[in-house]
């Protein structure tokens, strides 16, 4: 069962003045209960070592750690699960590798992909980009709130809106049926990460 509502996705390029681990620790201390390690440019060894460090931080705050795409590294680092890209590792295969208790998320950018992810055993999906955002420009124009509503209505698993999500936009996403929001720059790009997390918590009425 997915209990979190705010899903932090890492991008260490946004954290230039200190280690990513410190920023994630601040976010978890403020209430984040799920973190996706998404650093696609790192080699396997560096990603594994970072996953180990983030796993310790997440565990100390009772937060879940998911590793983007790499089920092997998620298993080696004893992470809580894996987040599969659209068209990437099938959720059912990821579960065979990580076990039945693993959390399996899937990125989706269309209604068809959302239905496919649910069919193949995803525990939750992200859908977007809902709003315009530089971090998701490669996925094309924003999907918008109506498509988010269509997806949230069509699937029975939790949907997290991603792409340009800010505290001011949270209520619109929840009103469309989203379970919560996935966030990158609005938290990691903030000068006060703990305050940014609290702003999301206030907008959602709890994390």
What name fits each language-model region?
Residues 121, 176-179:
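As written
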